[in-house]
Amino acid sequence: MKQSVSAEQIELKSSLPGSKKVYVDGPREGMKVPMREIEQSETNGVPNPPIRVYDTSGPYTDPAYKVELEKGIPTPRHSWIMGRGDVDAYEGREVKPEDDGVKVASKHTPVFPQMDRKPLRAKQGANVTQMHYARNGIITSEMEYVAIREGVEPEFVRKEIAEGRAILPANINHPEAEPMIIGRNFHVKVNANIGNSAVSSSIAEEVEKMTWATRWGADTIMDLSTGKNIHTTREWIIRNAPVPVGTVPIYQALEKVNGIAEDLTWEVYRDTLIEQAEQGVDYFTIHAGVLLRYIPITAKRTTGIVSRGGSIMAQWCLFHHKENFLYTHFEEICEIMKQYDVSFSLGDGLRPGSIADANDEAQFSELETLGELTKIAWKHDVQVMIEGPGHVPMHLIKENMEKELDICQGAPFYTLGPLTTDIAPGYDHITSAIGAAMIGWFGTAMLCYVTPKEHLGLPNKDDVRTGVITYKIAAHAADLAKGHKTAHQRDDALSKARFEFRWRDQFNLSLDPERAMEYHDETLPAEGAKTAHFCSMCGPKFCSMRISHDIREYAKENDLETTEAIEKGMKEKAEEFKEAGSHLYQ
């Protein structure tokens, strides 16, 4: 009897405190775009309006939704995909034990119950990518959905996709995903990496990490599983993921050849691409820019090649003394991608793994090749984003953004940090968030989170939470710096709540309400402290905001401007001092 993964096995939390799930009706029948609405209390009887924010949590935070992981979540895109009339259902490839990294399927593996689902692909001669539709002047339902989420016009979304400045990752076999967009003229997005390894984690844990990450604000998920049950883990994640899912197909291909890089072949890799496309993976990291001639350049580096995918392909190239088969077969890969609308995330296999290697010849040589490959993908109307570093000191970050925009013709940049120093293992979520905020400001479209476990171990769900929140801070700071028209609204609301001592509103408006409340209550746990005009930092006598309130009240009572009130108050205090005898100590 094969086991299943149930909601009881994982921790699923409802909406964040003070929030509720709301839906905005779209222009098409049945289109409902989710938002999170944060309630606010009154100020002296005057209402404060609720604040609506972008929501990535899917149906899990809707109290009306019954979670049944074995059935998957609703499929809002299915009718849109079928309604375009350019796809066919077909039998698909046979799922084999090797897909899960074993010779014989285990009876203990919790196979997803709906495995009889037939995959979709483009009809003969058709192209089903969002870029293809956009270039033909078609505004899809997905584009309309995204426009509501981003607060822009659908035509703007279409144009950004058509010109390659943004991607809308939306595999036709992942109808569960709520459409989102990645581009520098939209909100900066955050990706969270999850996935098992050969020594750690289970399917249930990875599904839990996915729901956990999206609850805290992850815009996409990458399943980087490298151990057993890769196919099955991915199926459970995709069928229950409300956000796009990315993978690095070379990891699974390597498992199929028993971890021996030189045994990899184009045929094994191609089969893996089709397998994952049929499951519904929305974007593939493909290290097609690691060319044979670039590998010797890395020999003088401090940390060599640190990308797993990059090192696998480098090993294959050196063993066979042949060019990277991902590069030589790139046009064939494009043909597969456009049948399912899988987006490219062109991998930076030669990214710097240390500050000493930042912005070196190997890194930028690969970037030149990624620019070449971008043009080829666009020729097929396949969506592309470019992966970036890595480890880069602050003064070298801007050059990365400028070169990417120039060499890759404005394709969205997707960066891992970058980490701005190498000396803080255990705190690399901080070292990288510094770089992430900067490069997001300069134009990076999506930031790949880093957790405190980076360089040390596989992150657990608490590390995932810390990583996501840290990167939501960086992304939001970048949105503010870029002047995104709605970015400041939440900041303004929280600042107003802080000045008015509306403690619960402060908690609820924050990126992590539970943590904010927890820290406040460590020193002032009483319910009355939630309305007190001070916190434990300054106490009641030294609270600057309480003093500011007193000044304003004094000005109001005496019909004065605030500056006049301060001057008048100082004169009155001086008179009191004189009348008391002008003694310094009473």
From Swiss-Prot:
Pathways per UniProt: Cofactor biosynthesis; thiamine diphosphate biosynthesis
Disulfide bonds: none
Binding site for Zn(2+): 391, 455
InterPro entries, alphabetized: ThiC, ThiC-associated_dom, ThiC/Bza_core_dom, ThiC/BzaA/B
Record GO cellular component, one term: cytosol
Basic and acidic residues: bias regions: 22-33
Job of this protein: Catalyzes the synthesis of the hydroxymethylpyrimidine phosphate (HMP-P) moiety of thiamine from aminoimidazole ribotide (AIR) in a radical S-adenosyl-L-methionine (SAM)-dependent reaction.
Stated name of the protein: Phosphomethylpyrimidine synthase
